[in-house]
């Protein structure tokens, strides 16, 4: 990669170039200069984004600038800008302004200038080339001249800097060219070089390799030498930095290494990060890269749950029980169907998967609040905050009216403070009942496990959360479940409250102050990272993560690398790109998780190209009647403790956790086999020959389902089934292994499946007596055997 210090020129030459550029700038680009006159040299850097308020909250990130706000950004130390820089050259972009305004950029610590750096109108993206002196600690300040309440995002792309032209210069470093590896190859030779100006006299040089971006698990054989070997534990895109010091100044250069995953690991990754790989998706993701796919998913438009108008809790005459109107407005039927169609076809697979995990932590059950208009705002909170900040999620879920109704906060007053929500936010939603180390292991003393809180903390939170209730009613006296709860000041307890870690809220605060302070107290507790992080690992990757895995995720929760706590994107990256989640094999025997019924069903359908019964459209999502007999009725968990407890021990597993085994029994195991039998062998009456189907609903009132039905695409598997001339079923077994088991089929299972398929002659269809043929029946048998096998039902 080209060295960041690759060109030097005089300041006058550069400013002259800016003046020429000013004469030819595009309509939405301006050029200005704000420079402290010094005897300087100008050094270019590879264009680098130093500030972007559109990304997660952080020192050089979001949120957007607000009207009247001044914010300071550190520039030195980023993008190859040394601490000695006197000024920086950058491109300033403003985007998404809510109103017309101006941005003033100037040295931090100095007075706000009167001249604007860039002017803009509402909704218009504009850019400006700027040279600005750096102030205190290499920082620049930005003032937003907009009306109060209006916001705008700003982006700083650095292209160069000025520094004193005399004295010692840092070494000029070249880390080497960018590189690519395809696993299982995971080692690379690095040959960095550097040059220096010979100052100071008698200088001694020290080199150091480091990792500035990418998954953990990188090892250098000689990290203090410019020439070294580097080994990667997992696929991903890595930025490696070579820094060289002359005992006074240091220079550095970066190179990028893209490590491509093996095909089995890509398929395993898609099982973890989505609702299962779809046909032909794996090659695309493998070429793209796992970390790049994650970032693309962060940007993907949300599918989710569209907002619904409010509905009365009293069923009107036109919605009698057992009518389509009643079904659609007073039962969870539409939301359950939407959950399954989002899971099957949504382009935002990662958001939907994380939101499903959050639903299992922050439980509101449709069994108690079945009306779609009332439950939808809760589901939208989960979707909206899946990639946001955990503190924001805590705040929005606390004031969500469905949650308030489900756990009784909506009726909690100073005279009757309710302990239900305070107890569950502690026990289930944030810190748990036992003090944890960062690696998720329990802390103990002479009395046993150390409790996280006692009854006095529950009492304190109950008082802090008093006074919140339903928002303004809609016409006709319809209760407001659409908007967050509102505060009734007279119903709030204004006495002092004891919170976690001995923190006391002072008396006299209003309800909003108490609620925010209480949530901050919960959010900043050191238990949140390991307690929530471990559960997310269990729901996405493995039921029994190692303490080291949990500790790495806790570290990402505590600090995203920008000093921000609770960044869900950082947590998701840490989980999915961790070496224990990635690699060429499933790891230890304890690795993996039982697929819960909803995920098992959707993964099966996605892998087999599920469409409508006639194969022309999406399936209708009417699948909850299929998972309910298996122990899981989606969006309707039986209690606030979710569908299954995260600390449930799998029977006979020697203490290993298996949360999903909490709803798995001999009956539900047989139910899975029966469902696969129906799914694979039901071809009678299906609209398309060769597409087994769950037939569309034929009820003229359409009370029990939509009309699309669901069918599977077996046509792509038939060519692998062999022929009478070449009857070996090995190609079909290999393809089923690749598509459903990610190449992990055991030798014993392969032998058994092969024997079963050999018993079926691979004949072609002979209508009218045999419209399917032996090849098709081989495919049916192979799919049945794999989908019902433990090796598929346990995701590894």
Where are the regions that the model predicts?
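Flexible, low-complexity segments enriched for small/polar residues
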Residues: 267, 271-274, 525, 529, ...
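Surface-exposed, flexible coil segments in extracellular/virion-facing regions
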Residues: 206-230
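Proline-centered linker/hinge motifs at extracellular inter-domain junctions
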Residues: 168-172
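Short edge beta-strands and adjacent beta->alpha junctions
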Residues: 27-167
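C-terminal edge beta-strand
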Residues: 251-260
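N-terminal accessory alpha/beta regions
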Residues: 279-385
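Active-site substrate-binding loop specific to GH73 endo-beta-N-acetylglucosaminidase modules
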Residues: 286, 327, 335-340, 371-620, ...
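Acidic, Ser/Thr
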Residues: 191-201, 212
């Amino acid at each position: 990669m080209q060295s960041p210090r690759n060109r030097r020129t005089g300041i006058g030459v550069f400013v002259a170039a800016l003046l020429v550029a000013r004469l030819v700038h595009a309509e939405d680009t301006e050029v200005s200069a704000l420079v402290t006159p010094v005897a300087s040299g100008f050094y270019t850097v590879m264009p680098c984004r130093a500030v972007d308020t559109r990304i997660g909250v952080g020192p050089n990130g979001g949120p957007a600038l607000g009207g009247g706000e001044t914010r300071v950004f550190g520039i030195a130390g980023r993008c190859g800008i040394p601490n000695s820089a006197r000024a920086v050259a950058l491109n300033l972009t403003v985007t998404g302004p809510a109103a017309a305004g101006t941005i003033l950029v100037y040295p931090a610590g100095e007075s706000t200038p009167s001249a604007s750096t860039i002017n803009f109108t509402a909704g218009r993206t504009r850019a400006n080339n700027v040279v600005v002196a750096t102030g205190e600690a290499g920082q620049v300040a930005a003032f937003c001249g907009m009306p109060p309440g209006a916001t705008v995002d700003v982006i700083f792309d650095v292209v160069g800097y000025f520094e004193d032209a005399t004295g010692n210069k840092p070494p000029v470093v070249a880390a080497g060219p960018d590189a690519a590896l395809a696993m299982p190859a995971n080692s690379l030779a690095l040959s960095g070089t550097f040059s220096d100006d010979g100052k100071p006299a008698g200088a001694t040089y020290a080199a150091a390799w480091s990792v500035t971006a990418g998954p953990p698990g990188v090892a250098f054989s000689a990290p203090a030498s410019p020439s070294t070997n580097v080994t990667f534990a997992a696929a991903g895109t890595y930025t490696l930095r070579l820094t060289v010091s002359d005992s006074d100044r240091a220079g550095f250069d970066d190179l990028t290494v893209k490590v491509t995953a093996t095909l089995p690991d890509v398929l395993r990754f898609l099982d973890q990060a989505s609702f299962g790989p779809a046909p032909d998706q794996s090659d695309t993701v493998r070429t793209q890269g796992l970390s790049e796919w994650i970032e693309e998913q962060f940007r993907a438009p949300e599918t989710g749950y569209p907002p619904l108008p409010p509905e009365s809790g009293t069923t009107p005459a036109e919605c009698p029980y057992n009518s389509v109107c009643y079904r659609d407005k007073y039962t969870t039927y539409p939301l359950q169907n939407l959950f399954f169609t989002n899971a099957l076809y949504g382009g935002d697979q990662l958001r939907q998967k994380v939101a499903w995990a959050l639903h299992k932590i922050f439980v509101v059950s449709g069994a108690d609040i079945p009306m779609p208009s009332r439950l939808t705002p809760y589901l939208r909170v989960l979707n909206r905050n899946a990639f946001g900040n955990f503190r924001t999620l805590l705040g929005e879920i606390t004031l969500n009216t469905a949650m308030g109704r489900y756990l009784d906060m909506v009726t909690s007053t100073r005279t009757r403070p309710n302990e239900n929500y305070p107890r569950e936010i502690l026990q289930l939603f944030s810190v748990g009942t036992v003090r944890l180390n960062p690696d998720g292991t329990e802390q103990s003393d002479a009395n046993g496990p150390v409790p996280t809180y006692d009854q006095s903390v529950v009492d304190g939170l109950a008082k802090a959360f008093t006074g919140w209730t339903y928002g303004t009613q809609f016409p006709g006296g319809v209760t407001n479940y659409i908007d967050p709860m509102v505060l009734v000041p007279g119903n709030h307890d204004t006495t002092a409250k004891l919170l976690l870690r001995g923190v006391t809220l002072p008396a006299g605060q209003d309800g909003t102050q108490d609620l925010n302070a209480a949530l901050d107290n919960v959010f900043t507790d050191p238990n949140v990272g390991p307690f929530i992080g471990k559960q997310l690992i269990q729901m996405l990757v493995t039921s029994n993560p190692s303490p080291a895995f949990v500790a790495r995720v806790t570290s990402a929760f505590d600090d995203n690398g920008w000093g921000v706590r609770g960044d869900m994107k950082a947590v998701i990256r840490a989980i999915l790109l961790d070496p224990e989640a990635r690699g060429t094999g499933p790891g230890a025997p304890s690795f993996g998780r039982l697929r819960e019924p909803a995920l098992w069903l959707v993964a099966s359908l996605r892998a087999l190209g599920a469409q409508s019964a006639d194969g022309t459209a999406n399936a209708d999502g009417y699948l909850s009647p299929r998972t309910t007999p298996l122990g899981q009725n989606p969006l309707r968990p039986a209690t606030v403790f979710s569908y299954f407890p995260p600390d449930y021990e799998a029977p006979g597993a020697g203490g290993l956790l298996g949360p999903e085994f909490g709803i798995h029994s001999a009956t539900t195991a047989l139910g899975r086999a029966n469902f696969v039998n129906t799914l694979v062998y039901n071809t009678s009456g299906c609209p398309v020959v060769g597409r087994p189907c769950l037939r569309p609903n034929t009820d003229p009132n359409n009370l029990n389902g939509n009309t699309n039905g669901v069918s599977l695409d077996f046509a792509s598997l038939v060519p692998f089934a062999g022929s009478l001339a070449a009857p070996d079923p090995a190609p079909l077994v290999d393809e089923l292994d690749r598509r459903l088991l990610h190449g992990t089929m055991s030798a014993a299972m392969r032998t058994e499946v092969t024997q079963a398929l050999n018993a079926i002659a691979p004949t072609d269809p002979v209508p009218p007596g045999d419209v399917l043929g032996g090849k098709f029946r081989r495919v049916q048998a192979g799919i049945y055997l794999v989908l019902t096998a433990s090796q598929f039902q346990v995701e590894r």
